Swiss-Prot record:
Coiled coil: none annotated. InterPro entries: CinA, CinA-like_C, CinA_C, CinA_KH, Competence-induced_CinA, MoaB/Mog-like_dom_sf, MoaB/Mog_dom. It holds the Pfam family CinA. This is Putative competence-damage inducible protein. The gene is cinA. NCBIfam families: cinA_nterm, molyb_syn, PncC_domain, PRK00549.1. Belongs to the CinA family. It comes from Pediococcus pentosaceus (strain ATCC 25745 / CCUG 21536 / LMG 10740 / 183-1w). It comes from the Bacteria.
Length: 413
């Protein structure tokens, strides 16, 4: 069957955001054997949306619209589709109750514009949104079927995975069950991991294997098709074993929505390993990330932001002579910062950060030159030097993420 994607949003046309949703859906449809015939991007304009629907309906079996389901006046995708197919919109009771409960919980008044998010086309099936308020739509006609989905990726992707896939399987009798497995790796570079698993990737058609790279970790997503869920799981587990035989030493977690930092903090909580930090260039960003994880208070009593040299000495005992002899961006200072923080708060481990975020150099140290230290209660200390590339924000972020990576490598792994 042929499908067409219509992305709705003036912000996409203006280049203010990247349309990752269309890419996500196209890749998924390809795995299902659904051919994406075309993609159209239109602004928040009723005539343009209806024109796109008319063109798409003439040449495609399935038309998917993405975006334009919010509460504002320019969110008009449902209204445009209703006018195009000649149907009325009415509030879906369950969706409207979800919106009502949400605003009541937030102690905010429910306005008419927010009720718009619960509108459903007469004769259509609702596609429920587990992560938002905008109700999706599936509408069947003799010539063309329509799926209407919200634009925020945090809502769109779960709806596609959890709601649209089963709906498509049921509606079109897709002959196979589709199951996915997501594996997460850290401590290995993009090129190295790709080279190690290249033979497996090249020789596999079921499951399909997709690699996604981020600055600090790598995700491998496996998607299998089979006649049953059990058979699909067997295929996935077989390929997972093949991959782990090659890169298992870098594997840290499995699951669709895994945050590396959450994983590390939760492992510390599980093992009752207390943590503190002494931060210079990162300015508290590491500690802020730690406390984003629920339950972090059980292992994180607090930390230190020691931006100035004198504060490093005053709060965590870094010797002025150490800074003078080695400069503040050095292994020796990272060691004393980590050791001082660990002893001061009597934690099991402590992480330290000292370096140059930029944009200028500091005492011959170039932007991106960072030392991270990790001190343990037993007196051992690990330090590592990094030379990150990027702007000030990126350098600070990479430093924070590699602090978590050092904990994983030296404490958890």
């Amino acid at each position: 069957m042929n499908a067409e994607i219509i992305s709705v949003g003036t912000e996409i046309l203006l280049g203010e955001i990247v349309d990752t949703n269309a890419v996500y859906l196209s890749q998924l449809f390809a795995k299902l054997g659904i051919d994406v015939f075309n993609k159209i991007t239109v602004g928040d304009n009723e005539k343009n949306i209806m024109d796109a629907l008319e063109v798409a309906s003439k040449r495609s079996d399935l038309v998917v619209t993405i975006g334009g389901l919010g509460p504002t006046e320019d969110d008009i995708t449902k209204q445009s589709l209703a006018k195009f197919v000649g149907k009325n919109l009415k509030h879906h009771p369950e969706a409207l109750q979800q919106i009502t409960d949400y605003f009541k919980k937030q102690n905010r008044p429910l306005t008419k514009n927010n009720e718009r998010q619960a509108l459903l086309l007469d004769g259509a099936k609702p596609i429920h949104n587990p992560n938002g308020l905008a109700l999706g739509i599936f509408y069947h006609t003799e010539q063309t079927d329509y799926i209407v989905l919200p634009g925020p990726p945090s809502e769109f992707e779960p709806m596609v995975d959890e709601k649209v896939l089963p709906l498509l399987s049921q509606q079109y009798g897709l002959e196979k069950t589709i199951q996915s497995k997501t594996l997460h790796f850290v401590g290995i570079g993009e090129a190295d991991l790709a080279a190690r698993v290249d033979e497996i990737v090249r020789n596999q058609s079921n499951p399909t294997i997709a690699l996604y790279f981020k600055p600090t970790d790598v995700t491998i997503r496996l998607t299998a098709k089979a006649n049953s869920k059990l058979a699909a799981e067997e295929i996935l587990n077989h390929t997972k074993k093949q991959l782990l035989d090659r890169v298992g030493e870098f594997f840290y977690a499995e699951g669709d929505r895994v945050s590396f930092t959450d994983f590390v903090v939760n492992q510390l909580i599980k093992r009752n390993i207390s943590l503190t930090a002494a931060e210079s260039l990162t300015g508290g960003a590491f500690e802020s990330t730690v406390v984003e994880t629920s339950g972090a208070a059980t292992i994180f009593p607090g930390g230190f932001v020691t931006y100035a040299d004198e504060v490093k000495s005053k709060l965590i005992g870094v010797q002025p002579a150490t800074i003078e002899e080695n400069t503040v961006v050095s292994r020796q200072v990272a060691e004393e910062m980590a050791r001082g923080a660990q002893k001061t708060l009597d934690t099991d481990i402590a992480v330290s950060f000292t370096g140059v975020a930029g944009p200028g150099a500091l005492e011959h140290h170039q932007p991106g030159n960072v030392w991270i230290g990790l001190a343990k209660r037993d007196g051992s200390i690990v330090t590592k030097e990094f030379n990150f590339v990027g702007n000030r924000e990126k350098i600070r972020h990479l430093a924070v993420m590699n602090g978590f990576r050092m904990i994983w490598e030296n404490v958890i792994k």
